């Protein structure tokens, strides 16, 4: 047979397409990989090893150029060995018996170590996987990444008080689905009595009735952002109701937890739309892109805005998985140390279940380096939220004390955050 070009260099496995069948360079059978510096089948690999170890001397009974195939490779050992050498197989690559034994022991040890490591590696239990699945579903049902409902709020008015001008705002439309929109707006908020939180049956679809007026005051964004916060409270209520164990609490404890955590969870939720590029909350269109000026136009000062932005930046940089994000929101809501909680032990038991799930998830699913101290950093964010909550309450009390501001808020906002006007 014609001699093929011999190769004595180590081929690069990357040069071979994994989808192309690999052929033994000796006999044409299906190759299993590179053996002793050449692509061969298991049969020719074993033949070459045995021949080299025995230092066998073969003689061709014919003229020394037999064509070696899968079917006749046993007929002429001399030409088969010659073919092995021609394609680049080298005896220097053959391990001694001692080396083979050491290699086998190393492989066995590595397998045992991997098995031990795998047995010690934390795994999410079925219950924990179920908790995560429920919370993800709850979040998807209560957070619309298209922000389509924002067009139903009172319009965002970015007023220039010095000139009396205002920026363009979206055209209001109240024509939509009557089942969802007909009760959302009435001509005047003065006609409304603030609804009792306890009588709302924790209904995330509860209605708020803001008035639609053109506001050129320094607080021109207050009506729009009040509607946004009211809408977010409804969604937080909906999310909380689906937290495993939350419905086991008394109605009083549910209300206490929701009232005390609402603004914190809203701040957590808003991180999904927060952008590091320009430190703003991007909710779809330019009209619904909010910056610190917009927050100040709703009556808040830098004492709240600066730590809020710092919090948003820090949380964004943690690069949380969605699973971690929803668990953090649930842990935030179900906090046994909230003032007024009656059955703190039950609340703590629910929170512990959520916290353990979060810790296990981080160890199982969040690869380093992002997972380093991640749980501790997330818990610190909850502490930061408490401080933000306190400052928000202080500024809200000051804001809502003025009747002209209080009347721009919604009944749900007044009920959750308090009504300073008696």
UniProtKB/Swiss-Prot annotation:
Biased composition annotated in UniProt, kind: Low complexity: 173-182
Short name of one Pfam family: zf-C4
One of the record's GO molecular function terms: zinc ion binding
Keyword Coiled coil (UniProt): no
Major place of residence: nucleus
Residues annotated for Zn(2+) 2 binding in this entry: 60, 66, 76, 79
Zinc finger (NR C4-type) stretch: 24-44, 60-84
Region (Disordered): 161-185
Protein name in the entry: Vitamin D3 receptor
């Amino acid at each position: 047979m014609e001699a093929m070009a011999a190769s004595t260099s180590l081929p690069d496995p990357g040069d071979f397409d994994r989808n192309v069948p690999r052929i033994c360079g000796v006999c044409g059978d299906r190759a299993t990989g590179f053996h002793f510096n050449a692509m061969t089948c298991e049969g020719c690999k074993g033949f070459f090893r045995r021949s080299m170890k025995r230092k066998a001397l073969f003689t061709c009974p014919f003229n020394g150029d037999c064509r070696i195939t899968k079917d006749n490779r046993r007929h002429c050992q001399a030409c088969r060995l010659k073919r092995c050498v021609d394609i680049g197989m080298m005896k220097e690559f053959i391990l001694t018996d001692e080396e083979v034994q050491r290699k086998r022991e190393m492989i066995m040890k590595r397998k045992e170590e991997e098995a031990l490591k795998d047995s010690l590696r934390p795994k999410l239990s079925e219950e924990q996987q179920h908790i995560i699945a429920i919370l993800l579903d709850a979040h998807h049902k209560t957070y619309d990444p298209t922000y389509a409902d924002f067009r139903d709020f009172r319009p965002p008015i970015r007023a220039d008080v010095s000139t009396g001008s205002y920026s363009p705002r979206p055209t209001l439309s109240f024509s939509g689905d009557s089942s969802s929109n007909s009760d959302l707006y009435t001509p005047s908020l003065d006609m409304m009595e603030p609804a009792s939180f306890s009588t709302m049956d924790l209904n995330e679809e509860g209605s708020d009735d803001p008035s639609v007026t053109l506001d050129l005051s320094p607080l021109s964004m207050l009506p729009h952002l009040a509607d946004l916060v009211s809408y977010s409270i409804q969604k937080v209520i909906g999310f909380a109701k689906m937290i495993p164990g939350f419905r086991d609490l008394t109605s009083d404890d549910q209300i206490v937890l929701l009232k005390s955590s609402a603004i914190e969870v809203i701040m957590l939720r808003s991180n999904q739309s927060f952008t590091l590029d320009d430190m703003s909350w991007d909710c779809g269109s330019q009209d619904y892109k909010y910056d610190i000026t917009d927050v100040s136009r709703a009556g808040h000062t830098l004492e709240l805005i600066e730590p809020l932005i710092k919090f948003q930046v820090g949380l964004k940089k943690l690069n949380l998985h969605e699973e971690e994000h929803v668990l953090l929101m649930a842990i935030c809501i179900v906090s046994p140390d909230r003032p007024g909680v009656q059955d703190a032990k039950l609340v703590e038991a629910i929170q512990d279940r959520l916290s353990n799930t979060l810790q296990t998830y981080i160890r199982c699913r969040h690869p380093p380096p992002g997972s380093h101290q991640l749980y501790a950093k997330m818990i610190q964010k909850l502490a930061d939220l408490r401080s933000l909550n306190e400052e928000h309450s202080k500024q809200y009390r000051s804001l809502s004390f003025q009747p002209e501001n209080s009347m721009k808020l919604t009944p749900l906002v007044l009920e959750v955050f308090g009504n300073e006007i008696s």
